[in-house]
């Protein structure tokens, strides 16, 4: 009874449990605060606010002394020797600007797009110049500092909607005045007017020990590897390997290590001795921890025996130095070895002096891990586990690039300073700093997508891509893409497979088909990528909480029983009460004293506690559960709804939700829904859950969240729809009239779907839809919908069904060839202009531009432009004198027609005149156009019947589309059938149907609802044949389904040719529709003709219609002879033959081949049969 009462007033009770509806309130709060491209923006802001300053602070000051002029390398010996040094200090970034008529002005993103500018902000830096005079020994040392304020060092492209973008704080009205769309999420750059995205790059985790088993062909059985890199500063990673060899017939072999800059593999024990641990006992204490462990001690024996010879640190260092790159005296070698051990080996542990203890402990730990794996006590690592992956977003990517460019800049400053000192000139900061280095370096990489400076070799391509603007969903999806930089050729299946740990982080369905399958992924809806925070606070906290530091451990055997503590892969100490430490850390994270994105992983089996604060980890939010109760209650929901101040951030800081990354996820138990937390009355086992999913449908990404009932479809169908949803036409952005995109498709009358999912709200799919609700019947009706084609209703098309507008923009610029010759926009005249096209010049005005509203057809000139010819020499005769200019106009594409929509004439960044012309054409659906439902069921239009020829129901309803029933059974897209049923209910009741996956909507419930309205339960209806008016035998499944028109239209693909342009080299027809090329009769077609025995046809295709050519050959030697047909004289000079010459026909390509063979002294002799 009391239970019943509790449920009754759950609305008023603030401590009541939450309902399914409340969960969506929380999700809405998340997206309101985060948006959909937060990961891009946060990462970029981190780069601007912290990384750039760090990089500049890290770079050492430039210090120089004057060199003697005649003995380079020797310092001038005199009393008043000055030492100059230059140090870069604080940086400043101003608002985005651009040069307009030589004046720097603020620029809005839309201006940048239209005028092909780069949306970037100038970067300034303070430079401190120090001059030291006199000498220390005499005590008259003087030092003068001079601070040069705000020296311009380059421009940094700004990500739209980031902290430094002018759209950051703007509200909807401001955005409209700036010509921006309020739905646009930002997260991309504008480089030379085109929008560029940085695709997140996946990589292996640094500073983490991996142990892998090697297969027989390799000579090692187990390999432990670690990619080590310092926390601050992206110095390149140094990788270290420890290798365990297979036991040979001579007995067991020792463990070898690969040390950076040392050419051979070195025995492990020698490395320990070089670190200063000489006695065997000391070394084994660092590796085995427990001397009672006989098996492990046995494994170490061969290693100790093999390094028995070397018994002191000096000898060990010399052993390493000998195998290094520098050969010198013994002292130099030892110094080299010490340097390598300090700076290059495991740099993440320490690069400071007195590094030995820490490094020995860590090195021992790596060895320990290798031994554990070879004893099969600890499982091997999984390369594809998502905890072992990190994502490089815009921040780290720009960071590495900026570091390389800044290095280059300092090098230039150094050279300039040296010149100043040698010539005793004044040091002028503005001329010392080449601002172009950083500006053009960043611009080049973002424009081409080639990442990394050209010479260092580490270039990746395809990192920056042009933002896809076909549909709004395709734009969003492109901003949330992940790329794995593995060669696409490798047929490796493992990295491509869906891994358990992808749950909730990567969309399971959205990935391309073909060679990039599984390597290009997309983020799930609520996935969050850590920005990274400093590890210092955590280290200080551990220090307070009785962590034993590695240097302080008195009894080394206690390591075996204690828990090791790692922070970002660095072993910082051991602890004897890990459970207390763990709960304290979690508590601190939940109340916000430690950053929310820190992950705390306790590995109980391996006695390790790993803490991570690094950037690029994938996390996702979950509800916190304590004592099997969700911490979020009705009161929090009410606050979210009613209180504008209460946001997602407050839920985090109150410890109601928390971010869990892929590694910590392995140590928690997650309930699927809050209902799962209520224990069944008769269940034996009660699970102790620690967290609860917010909503299972959040495992999907952008494109799959548009699919209704994806949990009722066969999985590849969802993948196909994810790819096709990106090609659907809709309104791709609301300011499309103000933009000049190269290509754009806009549907005339987009509709929001009758059957929606809850996630669509956050994708703005209701405001910017890409499709229409059409009435679909599943029937055969004539044979015009076989093999995935569909029958359309011509009358509906005439009323505007699926009509769309296609825009294409053409651009041109008056470039300067030289100082004298400048191109001009004008109407070219035939008598003064050389090289004019065959298109019509009538449409353009005298200023060289076509007026808006003019109808243009293929090959018409729309931008007239002339280039002056260089004044020619007199001896070329009078013929060339007439022409003073050359025509370099832009013509409309030959296969298109349309109406000029908009013409913009402006100046480009360099101050030249520059224009863009946009042409629009209406596209009416016709036979051959492609359509698809939201379930991967694509089809082309096979026939369009008028309304009176189509079947109709009792109510007089005529379908708009008829789909063939054969498309359903083998593809198992049951989701489409349920959508049709639910659509029928929605259309009748006027409510939106909810098709969110993993909810409790059942087909039975929908059928019942349909039955109530008065339709047949399964959605079938009696229909009448449109041709005869008779009742059809079968009942037909009919109802509204959401269909998309895809961008593949027959008008853009139709192509034929009789005669046309040929290639110069082979004289065969060129390839491609845009060049009016031929249709290739390929090898397979040739083989078919051979098997048919159609010899004459074969000759016609491959010879007469392709590149027939007439050659004269000498009958004596069989080589090509000289023929002059005008004079009717023939001769072969080799044979002194003028009479015995034959004329033959052969393909021009064969003639070319023969001549190339002749150039290589091979004589292909041809003899005719007389």
Curated annotation (Swiss-Prot):
InterPro entries: DNA-dir_RNA_pol_su2, DNA-dir_RNAP_su2_dom, DNA-dir_RNAP_su2_hyb_sf, RNA_pol_bsu_CS, RNA_pol_bsu_protrusion, RNA_pol_Rpb2_2, RNA_pol_Rpb2_2_sf, RNA_pol_Rpb2_3. Gene3D superfamilies: 2.40.50.150, 3.90.1070.20, 3.90.1100.10, DNA-directed RNA polymerase, subunit 2, domain 6, RNA polymerase alpha subunit dimerisation domain, RNA polymerase Rpb2, domain 2. Keywords: DNA-directed RNA polymerase, Magnesium, Metal-binding, Nucleotidyltransferase, Nucleus, Transcription, Transferase, Zinc, Zinc-finger. GO terms for cellular component: mitochondrion; RNA polymerase II, core complex. A zinc finger (C4-type) spans 1114-1135. The keyword Nucleus applies. Coiled coil: none annotated. It is found in: Nucleus. It is an enzyme of class 2 (transferase). Its main location: nucleus. Its EC number is 2.7.7.6. It catalyses: RNA(n) + a ribonucleoside 5'-triphosphate = RNA(n+1) + diphosphate. Mg(2+) binds at residue 788. GO terms for biological process: transcription by RNA polymerase II. CDD domains: RNA_pol_B_RPB2 (cd00653). Pfam families: RNA_pol_Rpb2_1, RNA_pol_Rpb2_2, RNA_pol_Rpb2_3, RNA_pol_Rpb2_4, RNA_pol_Rpb2_5, RNA_pol_Rpb2_6, RNA_pol_Rpb2_7. Belongs to the RNA polymerase beta chain family. Component of the RNA polymerase II (Pol II) complex. This is DNA-directed RNA polymerase II subunit rpb2. It comes from Dictyostelium discoideum. The lineage of its organism: Eukaryota, Amoebozoa, Evosea, Eumycetozoa, Dictyostelia.
């Amino acid at each position: 009874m009391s239970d019943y009462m509790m449920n009754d007033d759950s609305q008023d009770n603030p401590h009541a449990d939450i309902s399914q509806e409340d969960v969506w309130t929380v999700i809405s709060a998340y997206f309101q605060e985060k948006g959909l491209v937060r990961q891009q923006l946060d990462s970029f802001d981190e780069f601007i606010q912290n990384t750039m300053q760090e990089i500049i602070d890290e770079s050492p000051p430039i210090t120089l002394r004057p060199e003697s002029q005649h003995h380079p390398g020797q310092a001038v010996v005199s009393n008043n020797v000055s030492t100059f040094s230059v140090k870069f200090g604080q940086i400043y970034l101003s608002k985005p600007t651009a040069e307009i008529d030589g004046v720097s002005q603020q620029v809005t993103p839309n201006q940048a797009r239209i005028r092909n500018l780069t949306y970037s902000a100038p970067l300034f830096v303070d430079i401190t110049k120090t001059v030291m005079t006199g000498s220390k020994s005499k005590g008259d040392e003087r030092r003068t500092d001079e601070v040069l304020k705000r020296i311009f060092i380059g421009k940094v492209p700004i990500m739209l909607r980031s902290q430094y973008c002018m759209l950051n704080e703007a509200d909807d009205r401001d955005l409209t005045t700036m010509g921006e769309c309020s739905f646009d999420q930002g997260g991309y750059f504008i480089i030379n007017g085109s929008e560029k995205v940085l695709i997140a790059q996946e990589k292996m985790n640094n500073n983490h020990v991996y142990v892998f088993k090697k297969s027989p062909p390799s000579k090692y059985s187990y390999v432990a590897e670690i990619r080590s890199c310092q926390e601050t500063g992206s110095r390149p990673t140094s990788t270290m390997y420890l290798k365990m060899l297979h036991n040979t017939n001579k007995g067991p072999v020792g463990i070898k290590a690969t040390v950076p800059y040392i050419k051979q593999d070195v025995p492990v024990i020698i490395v320990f001795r070089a670190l200063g641990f000489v006695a065997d006992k000391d070394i084994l204490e660092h590796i085995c921890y427990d001397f009672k462990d006989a098996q492990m001690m046995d494994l170490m024996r061969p290693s100790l025996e093999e390094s028995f010879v070397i018994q002191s640190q000096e000898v060990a260092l010399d052993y390493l130095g000998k195998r290094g790159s520098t050969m010198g005296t013994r002292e130099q070698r030892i110094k080299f070895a010490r340097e390598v051990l300090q700076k290059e080996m495991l740099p993440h542990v320490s690069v400071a002096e007195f590094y030995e203890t820490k490094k020995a402990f860590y090195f021992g730990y790596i060895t320990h891990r290798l031994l554990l794996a070879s004893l099969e006590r600890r499982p091997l690592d999984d390369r594809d586990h998502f905890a072992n992956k990190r994502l490089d977003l815009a921040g780290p990517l720009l960071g590495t690039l900026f570091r390389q460019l800044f290095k280059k800049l300092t090098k230039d400053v150094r050279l300039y300073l040296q010149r100043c000192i040698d010539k005793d000139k004044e040091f002028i900061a503005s001329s010392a700093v080449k601002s172009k280095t950083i500006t053009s370096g960043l611009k080049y990489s973002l424009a081409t997508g080639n990442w990394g400076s050209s010479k260092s070799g580490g270039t990746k391509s395809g990192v920056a891509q042009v933002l896809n603007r076909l549909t709004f969903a395709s734009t969003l999806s492109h901003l949330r893409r992940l790329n794995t930089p593995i060669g696409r050729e490798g047929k490796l299946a493992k990295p491509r497979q869906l891994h358990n740990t992808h749950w909730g982080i990567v969309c399971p369905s959205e990935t391309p088909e073909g060679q990039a399958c599984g390597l290009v992924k997309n983020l799930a809806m609520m996935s969050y990528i850590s920005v990274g925070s400093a590890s210092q606070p955590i280290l200080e906290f551990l220090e307070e909480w009785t962590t034993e530091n590695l240097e302080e451990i008195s009894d080394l055997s206690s390591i075996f029983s204690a828990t090791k503590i790692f922070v970002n892969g660095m072993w910082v100490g051991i602890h004897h009460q890990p459970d207390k430490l763990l709960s304290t850390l979690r508590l601190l994270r939940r109340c916000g004293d430690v950053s929310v994105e820190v992950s705390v992983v306790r590995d109980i089996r391996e006695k390790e506690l790993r803490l991570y604060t690094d950037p690029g980890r994938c996390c996702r939010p979950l509800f916190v559960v304590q004592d099997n109760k969700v911490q979020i209650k009705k009161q929090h929901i009410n606050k979210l709804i009613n209180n504008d101040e209460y946001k997602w951030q407050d839920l985090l800081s109150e410890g109601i939700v928390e971010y869990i990354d892929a590694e910590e996820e392995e140590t928690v138990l997650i309930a699927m829904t809050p209902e799962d937390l209520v224990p069944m009355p008769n269940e034996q086992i009660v699970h102790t859950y620690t967290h609860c999913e917010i909503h299972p449908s959040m495992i999907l990404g952008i494109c799959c969240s548009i699919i209704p009932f994806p949990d009722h479809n066969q999985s590849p169908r969802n993948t196909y729809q994810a790819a096709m949803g990106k090609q659907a036409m809709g309104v791709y952005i609301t300011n499309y009239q103000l933009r000049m995109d190269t290509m754009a498709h806009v549907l005339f009358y987009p509709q929001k779907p009758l059957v929606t999912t809850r996630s669509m709200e956050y994708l703005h799919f209701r405001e910017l839809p890409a499709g229409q609700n059409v009435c679909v019947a599943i029937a055969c009706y004539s044979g015009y919908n076989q093999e995935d084609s569909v029958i359309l209703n011509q009358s509906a098309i005439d009323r505007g069904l699926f009509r769309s507008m296609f825009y294409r923009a053409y651009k041109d610029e008056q470039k300067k060839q030289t100082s004298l010759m400048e191109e001009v926009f004008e109407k070219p005249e035939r008598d003064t202009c050389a090289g004019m096209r065959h298109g019509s010049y009538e449409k353009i005005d005298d200023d060289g531009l076509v007026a808006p509203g003019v109808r243009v057809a293929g090959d018409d000139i729309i931008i007239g432009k002339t280039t002056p010819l260089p004044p020619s020499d007199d001896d070329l005769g009078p013929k060339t004198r007439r022409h003073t200019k050359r025509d370099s106009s832009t013509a409309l594409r030959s296969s298109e027609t349309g109406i000029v929509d908009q013409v913009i004439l402006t100046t480009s960044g360099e101050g030249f005149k520059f224009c863009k012309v946009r042409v629009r054409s209406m596209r009416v659906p016709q036979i051959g156009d492609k359509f698809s439902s939201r379930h991967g069921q694509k089809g082309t239009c096979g026939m369009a019947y008028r309304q009176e020829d189509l079947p109709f129901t009792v109510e007089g309803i005529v379908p708009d589309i008829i789909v063939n029933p054969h498309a359903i059974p083998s593809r198992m897209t049951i989701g489409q059938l349920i959508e049709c049923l639910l659509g029928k209910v929605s259309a009748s009741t006027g409510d939106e149907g909810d098709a969110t996956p993993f909810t409790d909507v059942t087909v039975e419930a929908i059928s019942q609802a349909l039955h109530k309205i008065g339709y047949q339960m399964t959605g079938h209806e009696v229909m009448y044949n449109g041709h005869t008016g008779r009742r059809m035998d079968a009942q037909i499944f009919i109802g509204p389904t959401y269909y998309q028109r895809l961008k593949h239209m027959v008008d853009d693909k139709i192509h034929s040719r009789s005669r046309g342009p040929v290639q110069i080299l082979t004289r065969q027809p060129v390839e491609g529709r845009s060049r009016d090329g031929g249709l290739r009769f390929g090898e397979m077609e040739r083989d078919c003709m051979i098997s048919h025995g159609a010899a004459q046809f074969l000759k016609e295709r491959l010879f007469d219609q392709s590149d027939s050519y007439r050659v004269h050959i000498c009958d004596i030697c069989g080589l090509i002879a000289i023929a002059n047909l005008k004079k009717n004289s023939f001769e072969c000079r080799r044979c002194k033959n003028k009479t015995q010459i034959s004329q033959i026909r052969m393909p021009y390509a064969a003639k070319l081949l023969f001549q190339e063979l002749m150039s290589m002294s091979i004589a292909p002799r041809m003899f005719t049969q007389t």
